[in-house]
């Protein structure tokens, strides 16, 4: 989607070697970080599936083993932490899923969240500064919800915006001269 724009470099994860590929991408990003204001990882949902598929290739059943899920959880947390340490805006995308929540009083609702493994989705959402939900209005305008409610998990720890147009997401902290 961004390929072909000025000042945009696109690297693709090697589906046959997703683990090594993300590590190589990090090494390149770190070595060249002074050339980038923003780094996008698109997307964590697909990456975790590729990672588990690769693990499954080495089993008799062709399916990942139980231990692989714990390894993936640790790996994803490290990926997010490691990329977040770079001196750039790091944006992780994920597909969306829902989870059903029942309160002690019996009230039930459905919450939209990033499609990341249940065991770590809360942790990952907790260690990033912004969790946003992309929405499209009837007129085609796309924007991000930056403040959540019980049905949408969203947060914005960078500024006071509750939402923004898609093109405005990274228009933050220009007055302070900071990338982040």
Residue map of PLM features:
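Conserved P-loop
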Residues: 1-41, 45-50
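Hydrophobic/aromatic beta-strand patches that form the interior of the parallel beta-sheet core
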Residues: 11, 91, 129-132
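Short, well-ordered coil/turn elements that cap or connect secondary structure elements
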Residues: 5-7, 85, 125-126
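Conserved, well-folded catalytic cores of nucleic-acid-processing
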Residues: 28, 47-50, 82, 127, ...
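P-loop NTPase motor core
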Residues: 38-123
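Conserved GTP-binding G-domain of TRAFAC-class P-loop NTPases and closely related GTPase folds
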Residues: 98-180
């Amino acid at each position: 989607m961004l390929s072909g724009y000025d000042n945009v470099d696109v690297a693709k994860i090697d589906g046959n070697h997703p683990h090594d590929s993300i590590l190589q991408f990090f090494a390149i990003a770190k070595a060249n970080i002074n050339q980038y204001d923003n780094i996008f990882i698109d997307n964590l949902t697909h990456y975790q599936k590729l990672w588990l598929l690769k693990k499954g290739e080495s089993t008799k059943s062709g399916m990942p083993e139980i231990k692989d899920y714990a390894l993936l959880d640790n790996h994803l947390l490290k990926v997010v932490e490691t990329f977040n340490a770079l001196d750039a805006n790091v944006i992780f995308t994920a597909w969306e899923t829902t989870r059903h929540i029942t309160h002690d009083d019996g009230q039930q609702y459905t919450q939209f969240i990033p499609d990341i493994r249940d065991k770590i989705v809360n942790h990952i959402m907790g260690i990033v500064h912004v969790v946003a939900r992309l929405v499209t209005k009837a007129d085609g305008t796309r924007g991000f919800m930056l403040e959540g409610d019980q049905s949408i998990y969203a947060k914005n720890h960078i500024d006071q915006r509750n939402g923004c147009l898609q093109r405005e997401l990274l228009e933050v902290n220009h007055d302070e001269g900071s990338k982040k």
